[in-house]
Amino acid sequence: MKKLCLVTYTRKNECYTQAIDLIAQKLNEDFMGDFKVVICCEEMIHVPQSNYEIDIFLKKGTKYRKLISLMENDDSLYYLSIDNDISGNIPAIRQFVKKLMCQRVDIGWGRIYVDSPHGLISNLVGVDKLLSHNLIRPTLWSLGVGISVPGQIFCIKGGRFRGNLINLDTFLDDLALGLYVNVNNCKKYIVNKNLGYERPNNHFWGLWNQRKRWAIGYGSILKGVFGINNYRWKVIIHGLGYHFSWILNWAIAGLLLVKFFPICILYLIFLSFIIVGKNLKMLPYAFLYQFIFPLFHVVWMISLVRFLSKGDSNEYYS
């Protein structure tokens, strides 16, 4: 039994990254060896030599299913889940894990931002990340209807989740995990600090296809829990908050445009400031985001309708 297990996930042609190794080295120092890394993968990969324990867990399927299966076969006290493509803010992660354990909570998370965006698409993704992590997610959780956990980095108490998570086969682990946390009133530790950076989509079609995948993942969760009233409405509210709020924004802007054009522009600029906060270099992209990014929400909506119309009403929950 280890006190902390860092879990990461690799797909085909991916390797254990130096960024994850650096995080692991520091955490191993903090826990004086009461620590290990588990790499969840579908086929054997090369494991570098290290001064801490590294195990391979072979499992096919989604990241969510891999995490569930790992906990069924492992007895670590805490699991720090980090995506393989994340560059960690190591001082923040170390402090986050220590405080989480001291407070004896069930789950904790922080914020994730985009790593060095360049070009229009990646900067729009960066704005979307700011909007999600700084505004939408905190607001929904504060209202008691949040179900989204940053899937890139989170830490959970093994005994609270082992054998208890909703048995969904979805690649949106952030929603499946967050839904369980909400419905079961798990104790949370949420920090406003940035815990890491992820590489953004740099291409139009890459982002387009990502939103289609997200719609299918969301739809699979909605189908799976549709028969449970408390679950169903929270999943629906999440979809409305993340993918339909732009409609309200356009409606307000449209009303102001009819009344007085400069007021409409000032409103959009003001909202851009709210989204980016202190990250003022993103301000121009936040303004453009309000006009361009709704296209990708429409792609999400259409993909969701197509998926739901297939009529496969399989119940994935248990």
Ranges and model annotations:
Residues 64-66, 90, 96-163, 168:
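Long helical/loop segments within the catalytic core of UDP-sugar-dependent glycosyltransferases
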Residues 100, 107-133, 168-170, 177-235:
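Catalytic donor/gating beta->alpha subdomain of glycosyltransferases that bind UDP-sugars
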Residues 12-28:
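Short, well-formed alpha-helical segments that are part of the catalytic scaffolds
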Residues 2-7, 36, 176:
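Cell-envelope/extracellular polymer assembly enzymes that use nucleotide-activated donors
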Residues 58-74:
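Glycine-rich, basic loop-to-helix element that forms the pyrophosphate-binding segment
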Residues 76-87:
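Short beta-strand-to-loop acidic/aromatic patch adjacent to the donor-nucleotide binding site
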Residues 8, 33-44:
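Short beta-strand/loop segment that forms part of the nucleotide-sugar
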Residues 243-316:
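Membrane-embedded multi-pass helical conduit in multi-pass membrane proteins
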